[in-house]
């Protein structure tokens, strides 16, 4: 029974790989979210969605992307939160009403949605920005679609992530891990959190643990509420 179970699992995994390979032959990029696969077609540069069984094929974008090349698909927790980052560093956001990809910003290194789905963070080599995805009626008030410059540095910014509270950011500048708040009233507080050679950072939101990797060594810190 165990052998049959293991064999069945192996066949299932190989079947999934074969299906993913079938999609990859006709797509530029693909990303798996749950049991759904999002991919950009090589033929028409539109975004599509299917499942692991390839039982359906749904066109997400109404019009093709404005440029050709390689892309990265970035998804939020909500079904309509989709951005695409091109190899030319152009960030496109899918308009959930028109279903058309609109250029949000050029020169973008990376982008991430907040866990609560209310914000999109994107950064370049020297700037960090926030796009608000819904109205904020409490202070500080924000409107849907409003963009805000959070910080700017002369040194290169290599990575940025949300804190689990979605109200603070951690980011890497040189060998320093810094933190900053999104609330820009009065004076925005930005502090040096840690110093480490070429650090890479990650938050486990559920366990509220901050990880950073430096010189092939992984460290963790438990966040206090």
Task: List where the protein language model places each region.
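Loop/turn-rich, solvent-exposed surfaces of beta-rich toroidal or solenoidal domains
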Residues: 152-179
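Extracytoplasmic beta-rich ectodomain segments of secreted or membrane-anchored proteins
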Residues: 72, 79, 85-89, 100-126
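Repeated scaffold domains used in trafficking and secretory/extracellular systems
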Residues: 23-35, 66-76, 106-118, 154-161, ...
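Charged, low-complexity helical/coil segments in non-catalytic cytosolic or luminal regions
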Residues: 123, 143-146, 152-153, 164
């Amino acid at each position: 029974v165990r052998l049959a179970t293991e064999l069945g699992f192996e066949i299932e995994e190989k079947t999934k790989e074969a299906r993913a390979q079938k999609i990859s032959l006709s797509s530029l990029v693909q990303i798996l979210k749950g049991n759904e696969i999002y991919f950009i077609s090589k033929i028409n540069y539109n975004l599509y969605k299917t499942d692991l069984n390839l039982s359906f094929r749904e066109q997400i974008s109404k019009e093709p992307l404005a440029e050709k090349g390689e892309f990265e698909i970035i998804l939020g927790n909500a079904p309509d939160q989709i951005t695409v980052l091109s190899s030319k560093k152009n960030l496109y956001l899918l308009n959930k009403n028109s279903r058309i990809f609109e250029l949000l910003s050029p020169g973008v290194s990376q982008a991430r949605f907040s866990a609560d789905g209310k914000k999109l963070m994107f950064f370049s080599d020297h700037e960090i920005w926030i796009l608000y995805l819904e109205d904020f009626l409490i202070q500080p008030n924000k409107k849907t679609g409003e963009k805000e410059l959070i910080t700017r540095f002369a040194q290169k910014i290599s990575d940025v992530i949300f804190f689990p509270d979605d109200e603070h950011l951690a980011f890497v500048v040189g060998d320093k891990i810094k933190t900053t708040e999104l609330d820009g009233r009065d004076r925005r507080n930005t502090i040096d959190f840690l110093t480490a050679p070429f650090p890479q950072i990650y938050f486990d939101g559920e366990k509220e643990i901050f990880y950073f990797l430096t010189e092939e060594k992984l460290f963790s810190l438990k966040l206090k509420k």
